[in-house]
């Protein structure tokens, strides 16, 4: 038989569990990228070559959002290289190189910002000293309705390469083509398995947001 004090403790535990469960920040709602073993990258392709680098940081950027029990963090991965071969219908080839070694936490300042950036570069996460770059190489493209297409490519992080497929909005303009996407991946697929503290566990689902605005190569 449970006494009143015991029942009170049980209720308290249940309430705390409910708070932790409902309060755990979820990854942003977005399509889950299909993940498979790496595929062969096709050389060349029809279309015009564009670059997606420029002085305007907001024009082309890649943001990763990670979540945990107590909240979330937004991390920008600087783009070192970004080129693609485009037609008005699809993307026939392309490569993006990310500067993992110079990642930037966007939602913190000062010592907290520096501390988290250092931890993200450590072996617990991206091991930036050993793997200073991340790479995405296009392997396929399928046109869907309207401006939507499905882009496939090999994503390499921490020396692990997996094929991913995700939807994106693609608008072809001969002078300034754009591509935008938001999708989720499971970080465990790339060996990023740090769990976090017992009372502040990190979710496996990570959101990737892509915004690219191009200009003809050589212009």
Give the residues covered by each predicted segment:
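Low-complexity, acidic/polar, glycine-enriched regions of mature
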Residues: 24-219
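Sec-dependent bacterial lipoprotein signal peptides
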Residues: 1-22
């Amino acid at each position: 038989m449970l006494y009143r004090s015991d029942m009170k403790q049980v209720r308290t535990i249940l309430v705390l569990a409910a708070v932790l469960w409902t309060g755990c920040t979820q990854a942003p709602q977005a399509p889950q990228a299909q993940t498979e073993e790496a595929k062969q990258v096709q050389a060349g392709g029809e279309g015009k070559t564009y670059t997606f680098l420029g002085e305007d940081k907001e024009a082309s950027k890649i943001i990763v959002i990670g979540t945990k029990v107590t909240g979330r963090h937004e991390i920008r991965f600087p783009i070192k290289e970004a080129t693609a071969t485009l037609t008005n219908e699809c993307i026939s080839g392309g490569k993006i190189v990310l500067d993992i070694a110079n990642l930037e936490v966007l939602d913190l300042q000062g010592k907290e910002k520096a501390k988290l950036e250092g931890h993200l570069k450590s072996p617990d996460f991206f091991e930036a000293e050993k793997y200073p770059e991340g790479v995405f190489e296009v392997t396929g493209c399928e046109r869907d309705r309207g401006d939507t297409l499905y882009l496939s490519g090999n994503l390499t992080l921490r020396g692990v390469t997996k094929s991913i497929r995700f939807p994106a909005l693609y608008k072809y303009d001969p002078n300034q083509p754009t591509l935008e996407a938001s999708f989720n991946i499971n970080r465990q697929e790339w060996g990023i398995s740090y769990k976090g503290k017992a009372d502040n566990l990190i979710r496996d689902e990570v959101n990737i947001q892509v915004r690219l605005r191009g200009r003809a190569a050589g212009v």
